[in-house]
């Protein structure tokens, strides 16, 4: 499935970063902070695009469109997960119904395209979807790291569209640093923008929007 391929290529990014820094001393410098680690993996998903046809055959174009669109819509979703956690941790006495109501309200803000009125899917329409996000239970406040990393991964995606070889040089410049620097310094040393800069998110979204709008949907259902 699409998810299987995304997981394999995602984890390959983590493995590649680990292998690249396997001889680093001290060993605590092999890995950077969590959001920086996720750049390795989420970016590798896009670097693997040239091999997508080996997995999807005639459905390759469908996968490319879905993958990029999903990467974009993940950012508001991931931000919503973080916002939800702030709410429930600040108000630990909330009832289950109040938590569900908070999630439903946030869905309307961050993902207004989601249909919250389908009576056939009460688990979702009642605002209980957050219970499926295991990070909320197992790794509190980790999810925003994925959003930061996804923004950088989209930087790499935009670079790849222009020059794959040059994009890979930037990826290697980022990866070989291991955990020797802070997240923002890793980016700076690799010639990348920081996702904390508004221009970064605006830039990658504009590039992705143009690509998606010009995508030939012929034969795709």
Show which residues each predicted segment covers.
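Short pre-active-site segment immediately N-terminal to the catalytic Zn-binding motif
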Residues: 1-9
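Short, solvent-exposed segments of well-ordered alpha helices
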Residues: 3, 28-35, 68-71, 75, ...
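C-terminal, non-catalytic "cap/extension" segments appended to globular domains
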Residues: 8-9, 16, 43, 54, ...
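Generic detector of well-ordered alpha-helical packing
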Residues: 11-12, 39
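Short, glycine/acidic-rich hinge or "gate" loops at secondary-structure transitions
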Residues: 24-30, 53-64, 163-170
């Amino acid at each position: 499935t699409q998810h299987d391929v995304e997981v394999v290529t995602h984890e390959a990014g983590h493995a590649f970063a680990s292998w690249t820094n396997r001889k680093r001393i001290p060993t605590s410098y092999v890995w950077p902070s969590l959001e920086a680690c996720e750049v390795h993996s989420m970016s590798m998903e896009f670097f693997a695009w040239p091999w997508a046809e080996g997995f999807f055959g005639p459905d390759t174009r469908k996968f490319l469109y879905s993958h990029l669109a999903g990467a974009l819509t993940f950012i508001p979703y991931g931000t919503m997960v973080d916002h939800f956690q702030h709410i429930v941790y600040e108000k630990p006495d909330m009832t289950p119904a109040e938590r569900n109501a908070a999630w439903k309200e946030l869905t309307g803000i961050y993902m207004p395209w989601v249909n919250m009125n389908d009576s056939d899917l009460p688990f979702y329409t009642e605002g209980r979807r957050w219970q499926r996000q295991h990070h909320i239970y197992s790794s509190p406040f980790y999810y925003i790291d994925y959003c930061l990393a996804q923004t950088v991964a989209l930087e790499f995606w935009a670079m790849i569209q222009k020059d794959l070889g040059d994009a890979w040089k930037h990826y290697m410049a980022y990866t070989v640093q291991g955990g020797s620097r802070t997240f923002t310094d890793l980016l700076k040393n690799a010639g990348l923008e920081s996702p904390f800069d508004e221009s970064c998110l605006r830039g990658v979204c504009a590039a992705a929007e143009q690509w998606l709008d010009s995508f030939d949907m012929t034969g795709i259902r």
